[in-house]
């Protein structure tokens, strides 16, 4: 749900959810991540061909990301029922709602441990505090996001690639503001 209809305009065929599963099967993707509705409707026809990462939380890109939070809309039990191979969770590091996010992630991680499911965390810096310390794509913010996801129990962490921006990097805490990358 983070990728709304506008994301499909460059490739109109991708508007069809089944296209994504067909492409993943034909190209032998290592996995396909999707929300519960797509997984329930399309995954049964591709089980065994395409490994599934069930995203258990998500948000639209309609509201600003200043107070980013992705509510859970599926469970680890749903993933087990569907035959998923892993759980996906988006964590917004630095958001004013980070405490809620971490509590929600704790429950998801406990359920992953209980069911033996690997946990993939999309760890993205967001919010005014992040903006004030170099921005969401600074090395500082990405490094922190990686570390937090690992410490929270992620088996795999998905991050944005840091972008070097000397003008913004000077706002990062030491020693990040002095690093030459």
Tell what function each PLM region has.
Residues 2-181:
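Alpha/beta enzyme core
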């Amino acid at each position: 749900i983070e990728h709304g209809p506008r994301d499909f305009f460059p490739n109109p065929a991708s508007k069809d959810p089944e296209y994504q599963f067909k492409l993943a099967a034909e190209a032998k993707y290592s996995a396909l991540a999707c929300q519960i509705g797509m997984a329930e409707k399309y995954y049964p026809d591709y089980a065994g061909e395409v490994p599934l990462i069930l995203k258990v939380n998500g948000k639209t890109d309609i509201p600003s990301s200043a107070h980013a939070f992705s509510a859970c809309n599926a469970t680890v039990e749903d993933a087990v029922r569907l035959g998923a191979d892993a759980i996906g969770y988006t964590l917004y590091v630095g958001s004013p709602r980070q405490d809620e996010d971490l509590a929600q992630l704790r429950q998801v991680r406990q359920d992953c441990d209980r069911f033996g499911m690997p946990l993939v965390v999309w760890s993205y810096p967001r919010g005014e505090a992040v903006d004030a310390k170099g921005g969401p794509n600074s090395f500082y913010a990405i490094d922190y996001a990686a570390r937090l996801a690992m410490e929270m129990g992620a088996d795999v962490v998905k991050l944005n690639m840091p972008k070097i921006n000397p003008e913004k990097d000077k706002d990062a805490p030491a020693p990040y503001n002095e690093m030459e990358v």
